[in-house]
Amino acid sequence: VERAKGILMQTQQLSDDDAFHILRTASMHTNQRLGQVSQHIVQSARFAEDVNRCGQLRMLSQRLVTLQVLQGVVQSGPFAQQLAESVQRIDANLVYLGKSLSQATYGELLGQVQQTWAGLQPGVRASAGAEAAVAAYARLDELAEHLLQGAERLTGQLESASPAPPLRVLNLAGRQRMLSQRFAKYAVLALMGDAPLQACSATGMAESRAAFEAALTYLNGLPLSAPDIHSALGAAGIGWLTLLAATKVAPGAGEAAQVNGLAEARERLIAVLEQLSAHYEHSMQMLTGA
């Protein structure tokens, strides 16, 4: 009961008395003992964090490639620091999931993700020469795709095993982070000037855009009880349109200006989407299953 109260107090900004009142009300409405309701909230919060962290791995797999390319195209800027922070986040999430997830149930899937990450890290740390740049980025993208697929499988397994119905919505909202970074990745790769890479990037941008916009439409159509979710969805829509506009070449604009515009729009959008995922993760619907 104390753990459940603590979760409600932290995520809903409630006092101790208000958190206990919510637990007691939920207990009466569901005809369950207070301990059962509390256990459900604790389990839901853990499942939600597991799914959110797996979802971050999906996003970070695409972010790594984008930042590596941006580092090569633009010599100055925050990209090296952002890349290092992304690597640290992947490491931290894998450590957390290794402790949180059941080894018997998820050990094989998590092990595959860890192995893929170990193979990807040398490519992230390497700096390719000018002639090998396109080939190196293509190889890095291929390895990042394996990391994405492994994280997708693990996230899907977690979603299907959870007793909380709203977890699908959390997973869908969290996946928007990956799709936005994936779209930006292809937009940046298209600037490399390699014809096959440009063709692949055009297809990737179209697919990512369609998936992102379909999910955003779905999320906007759900009944909302939290103003912060409604506000974040609106900001995500604006941020998405800004990112789309940044992919259009303005007359007279140089490559550096376009790259910087893409990078800034991408960063603003991911900040909004991270906030949106946090709102869903900590929502009362997520915690109580209502």
Regions from the PLM with identified roles:
Residues 1-290:
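Hydrophobic alpha-helical segments
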